[in-house]
Amino acid sequence: MIDEMAEKPGAIAKMVAWQKEHISDRQMTLILAFVIGLLASVAGFFLHSIVHEIQILLTSGFEKSTYNLLFLLFPIVGIYLTSLFIKYVVRDNISHGITRVLYAISTKQSKLKGHNCWSSVVASGITIGFGGSVGAEAPIVLTGSAIGSNLGQIFRMDKKTMILLVGCGASAAIAGIFKAPIAGLVFTLEVLMVDLSMASLLPILISCVTATCFSYILMGEKSLFDFTLTDPWELDRVPACILLGVFCGFVSLYFMRAMSACEGFFAQLKQYPYVKLLFGGIILSSLIFLFPSLYGEGYSAVNILLKGRTEADWDMVMSNSLFYGHSQLLVLYIGLVTFTKVFATSATNGSGGCGGTFAPSLFIGGFAGFFFARIWNIYKLGVYIPEQNFTLMGMAGVMTGVMHAPLTGIFLIAELTGGYLLFIPLMIVCISSLLTISIFESHSIYALRLAREGKLLTHHIDKAALTLMGMQSVVEKDYHPVSPDLPMGKLVSEISRSNNNFLPVVNQAGVLLGIIDITRIRHIIFRSELYKRFKVKQLMLQPSAVLSDHEPMQEVMKKFDETDAAQLPVVDVNGVLKGYISRTRLYSTYRQIVADMSAE
């Protein structure tokens, strides 16, 4: 769509032409960084407004002291409306927002579709507003990244700048939605794997600061989480902080494994959309009815734990539930909510809703931290630890474990709450959590799927270069296939027209049967008495290796190293020949990408 716009004569094409003539790409990148920050903050404000207004409309009349049967209805309605919107308006898959951004960077030259600039905002707004137990952050990250990608496509930026603009959009989304510019910056570094050099640092900072400033203008100065530090950190709480980090690591592992299992279950129902909607909707509605804290993002419930000072304050987290008024069940309620949140999130997305796992990880972390502190204090396992502080540190710990992003966890929580006085315990918890989860999972919840497919862009420059190459950039099509029944005399004629040292042998369906290695038959090709005696099928060899057209480039490079071949054929899933890759072109393309990535 963007390419077509740029090709058509008109205002946009003229603007791009004027820019190329009068403004350097470096200057234009800085301008676009500002625009991306502005638009990302507006998108975040719009999404939160949708969610807030829908929730006020639906739940403002609920009595806190009694349960409400409408909790059984609202989530199903929201998921159904979202499914209709995606099916008939968007007509594309917009789930897994951050994973989709990572996929675009590694395999699609950072190109995201135009509808991603708005579709996730609307879909997730409906889902969360009606009670879907997911987060708004991943849809906003996808939206911000799509804004950066589409602006980059309009102004025809190069591949490296496209990655940078996508990173600007993602960082602006996080910075704007949380009013946390440093967290937005390190999120791009840790989660999206965008390398920061002096050339890329400035545009991302511009986007983060711009998004933060406009978020203050649009949404006021109030922080997303209301926290006041009344009990400063003390050195004798270090053992508790370490144990909390380990606990958060195991909670993160449970979250990731349970999410993966639930996604697999709902994927099996893909052919039965209404069954999937009904089944997931019933699970979600039932959980929200039992535990209303699971309604929507759940940040209001986390704020109750952060602001509370007494049992009476914390009991408010059980409002609208069957547990309300039974303060002795508070710890049980907190534990059950922590355990069931992952199923509520999975049911929301699996049944057709739209949302991310960013907010659920913060929610689970907050509840897990409070649960840990209450158990510790009730059974007097050591020195007293303040529940509010450990709720905050639990949020950082679980987010670190789920995203493998300790700096994001530390700076986000510190910026959100102004809790810089808790910097050291935050670091202890995040490090302990990351060390624990890393024993079992080497990738974040966003990168896990791509890592298994060999499509994950990392900070390792060699692996990143291979990921960015892509199979299509090195496959050559200038081959001359021959039939297995072709006489040797005609084969010699084909050899004279070929510029390669091998000819692929294919059947009538185009399926690869073998190859003719010219270097192996050079000693007989001039013996005319053999021309009618031999056919291609008697002379062909099996290639030392065959490449799949969807094979990760790391595996392609490995096969060339193992076989020492000059060329290797490429086939599709049915064995049909699609071309070949030459060692010369492979290494030439690789060296060029490494040089581009290393250049400032």
Predicted segments, located by residue:
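Structural signal for short hydrophobic segments within the conserved structured cores
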Residues: 478-482, 538, 543-546
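The conserved cystathionine-beta-synthase
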Residues: 482-499, 506, 525-528, 546-573, ...
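Alpha-helical transmembrane segments and immediately membrane-proximal extracytoplasmic
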Residues: 1-468, 472-478, 482-513, 567, ...
